[in-house]
């Protein structure tokens, strides 16, 4: 069964058209109308091996927040839909990713219980403007939105870093690598990887 999803979400604030394939090769076509976010979501697709197409636009003349958040919501919903009954997945994974002086660790449990803990960001990171439009605070918001709508438990920890761009990129890449391995089908797993029999 193909692990794919295609979701269109339209509100008065944004229009999101997102398609993904969990068993892809990391091919991406990303246009969120927010250049730095394009860069981050492209990295997320590339390093998770998710084929990812996103066409999004919104009221970025007011602020990029709505478009960024709504894209993360739809990405999380698409992950959940594509994972289906979660039979055969590895479920747990972690990844630690450097980018020059920055180091981020992501730990993922595809549990069906949404939870997100972000820690370790340097003081003032949330106020930094990255790429002209994207604030550091949006990184945490994206992680929370993905985790909540995908139904996953995510711990994201910044272990080191000074440059806000490097920190954010290390976080997105760490999430990508952790998702890649957590979503992967393990041929030794028969059914759902839970003692309850459901996730």
Swiss-Prot record:
Keywords associated with the record: Amino-acid biosynthesis, Cytoplasm, Histidine biosynthesis, Lyase
GO biological process: L-histidine biosynthetic process
Cellular-component GO terms for this entry: cytoplasm
UniProt xrefs under InterPro entries: IGPD_sf, ImidazoleglycerolP_deHydtase, ImidazoleglycerP_deHydtase_CS, Ribosomal_Su5_D2-typ_SF
Reactions that this protein is recorded to catalyse: D-erythro-1-(imidazol-4-yl)glycerol 3-phosphate = 3-(imidazol-4-yl)-2-oxopropyl phosphate + H2O
EC number(s) reported in the record: 4.2.1.19
Keyword Metal-binding on entry: no
GO molecular-function term, one example from the UniProt record: imidazoleglycerol-phosphate dehydratase activity
Compartments, record wording: Cytoplasm
Pfam families: IGPD
Pathway: Amino-acid biosynthesis; L-histidine biosynthesis; L-histidine from 5-phospho-alpha-D-ribose 1-diphosphate: step 6/9
UniProt record similarity statement: Belongs to the imidazoleglycerol-phosphate dehydratase family.
Disulfide bonds: none
Main location as per UniProt: cytoplasm
Record-given protein name: Imidazoleglycerol-phosphate dehydratase
Gene: hisB
Keyword Lyase listed: yes
């Amino acid at each position: 069964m193909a692990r794919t999803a295609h979701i269109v979400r339209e509100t008065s604030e944004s229009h999101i058209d997102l398609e993904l394939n969990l068993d892809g090769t990391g091919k991406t076509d990303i246009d969120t109308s927010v250049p730095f976010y394009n860069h981050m979501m492209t990295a997320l697709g590339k390093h998770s091996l998710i084929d990812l197409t996103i066409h999004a636009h919104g009221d970025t003349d007011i602020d990029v927040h709505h478009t960024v958040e709504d894209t993360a919501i739809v990405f999380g919903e698409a992950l959940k839909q594509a994972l289906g009954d979660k039979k055969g997945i590895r479920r747990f994974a972690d990844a630690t990713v450097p980018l020059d002086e920055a180091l981020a660790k992501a730990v993922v449990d595809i549990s069906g219980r949404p939870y997100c803990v972000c820690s370790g960001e340097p003081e003032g990171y949330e106020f930094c403007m990255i790429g002209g439009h994207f604030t550091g605070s949006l990184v945490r918001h994206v992680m929370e939105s993905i985790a909540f709508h995908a139904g996953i438990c995510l711990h994201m920890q910044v272990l080191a870093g000074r440059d806000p761009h490097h920190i954010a990129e290390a976080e997105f890449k760490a999430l990508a690598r952790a998702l890649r391995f957590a979503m992967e089908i393990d041929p030794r797993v028969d059914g759902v990887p839970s003692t309850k029999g459901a996730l």
